[in-house]
């Protein structure tokens, strides 16, 4: 089996732009796919005394998201029951959370995680920030559409009623998904201007011109901002992350830090979040599950590579140490291998 390093080298040689994001996913479409057979096997597994969790995990973690939708359709046709409801009754705990997450489309999954982050008393700002800061324009536009479909209200409205101040402004601007797309022309003049404007609006003055930071960081393309943050160092004695820590506090600080880390290196950002979810006593399972489910078909190979490079041991190893049972098995399948 090729190591993740070999696969990434091969893909980068082929050129990033010609490579669909799924090429970096750990979960691929299953070759000999038969939705009817899978639906029958899952039905049998659910009916087995004590529930045959191993079969359920084996099937659903080794099929692409599109294939899982086909299985759910075939299951409903067979049994006149929804697969998600049947599995909700059959499973429990963290394993149930993983499996039900895998049955949703990526946009449905993100929409439901966002809704959960804003439901009831208090907001789970951490989850809100992670999803809104890390998704692409296309992903955010699809999330907005699906959110309205699922909850009969706008994502923006819910963000507005659940947040406040500059943090609200930043989240609303990002959630629109209207960032400039990657241009083929590099505008060095604008890079320099933006770097200087970020410095003038923050470290250089007393108080911070937050709207200026928001407009630059939510409107410019990712490759442009990567160059802006590099250029910024020639104006400021601090890099962008250090400047954020000096200039703003609370949820706004957290959001800007997450955003800049996502822009600089998204796979590393997720590797850090995964590490933080497992380090020390106890596991932050919600974060661990969300990243493993949502990135498994996007960039898990890159995340694994960054994780090993920074932390010296593989993501697979950490999951093995920190989880157990069929829940562990499901996460390891989504991880896709040891490095």
From Swiss-Prot:
One of its GO terms (biological process) is fibrinolysis. Keywords: Acetylation, Annexin, Basement membrane, Calcium, Calcium/phospholipid-binding, Extracellular matrix, Host-virus interaction, Isopeptide bond, Phosphoprotein, Repeat, RNA-binding, Secreted, Ubl conjugation. Phosphorylation of Tyr-24 enhances heat stress-induced translocation to the cell surface. ISGylated. Transmembrane segments: none annotated. PROSITE patterns: ANNEXIN_1 (PS00223), ANNEXIN_2 (PS51897). InterPro entries: Annexin, Annexin_repeat, Annexin_repeat_CS, Annexin_sf, ANX2. Changing residue 98 to L: Does not affect interaction with PCSK9. GO terms for cellular component: adherens junction; AnxA2-p11 complex; azurophil granule lumen; basement membrane; basolateral plasma membrane; cell surface; collagen-containing extracellular matrix; cornified envelope. The modification Phosphotyrosine is found at residues 24, 199. The modification N6-acetyllysine is found at residues 49, 152, 227. It comes from the Eukaryota. It is found in: Secreted, Extracellular space, Extracellular matrix, Basement membrane; Melanosome. There is a cross-link at residue 49 (Glycyl lysine isopeptide (Lys-Gly) (interchain with G-Cter in SUMO2)). There is a cross-link at residue 49 (Glycyl lysine isopeptide (Lys-Gly) (interchain with G-Cter in SUMO1)). Annexin repeats lie at residues 33-104, 105-176, 189-261, 265-336. The modification Phosphoserine is found at residues 26, 184. GO terms for molecular function: cadherin binding involved in cell-cell adhesion; calcium ion binding; calcium-dependent phospholipid binding; calcium-dependent protein binding; cytoskeletal protein binding; identical protein binding; phosphatidylinositol-4,5-bisphosphate binding; phosphatidylserine binding. It is linked to Increased expression of ANXA2 is associated with hepatocellular carcinoma tumor progression. Calcium-regulated membrane-binding protein whose affinity for calcium is greatly enhanced by anionic phospholipids. It binds two calcium ions with high affinity. May be involved in heat-stress response. Inhibits PCSK9-enhanced LDLR degradation, probably reduces PCSK9 protein levels via a translational mechanism but also competes with LDLR for binding with PCSK9. Binds to endosomes damaged by phagocytosis of particulate wear debris and participates in endosomal membrane stabilization, thereby limiting NLRP3 inflammasome activation. (Microbial infection) Binds M.pneumoniae CARDS toxin, probably serves as one receptor for this pathogen. When ANXA2 is down-regulated by siRNA, less toxin binds to human cells and less vacuolization (a symptom of M.pneumoniae infection) is seen. A pair of annexin repeats may form one binding site for calcium and phospholipid. Belongs to the annexin family. Heterotetramer containing 2 light chains of S100A10/p11 and 2 heavy chains of ANXA2/p36. Interacts with ATP1B1. Interacts with DYSF. Interacts with COCH. Interacts (via repeat Annexin 1) with PCSK9 (via the C-terminal domain); the interaction inhibits the degradation of LDLR. Interacts with CEACAM1 (via the cytoplasmic domain); this interaction is regulated by phosphorylation of CEACAM1. Interacts with APPL2 and APPL1; targets APPL2 to endosomes and acting in parallel to RAB5A. Interacts with S100A4. May interact with UBAP2. PANTHER family: ANNEXIN, ANNEXIN A2-RELATED. It may cross-link plasma membrane phospholipids with actin and the cytoskeleton and be involved with exocytosis. This is Annexin A2. It comes from Homo sapiens.
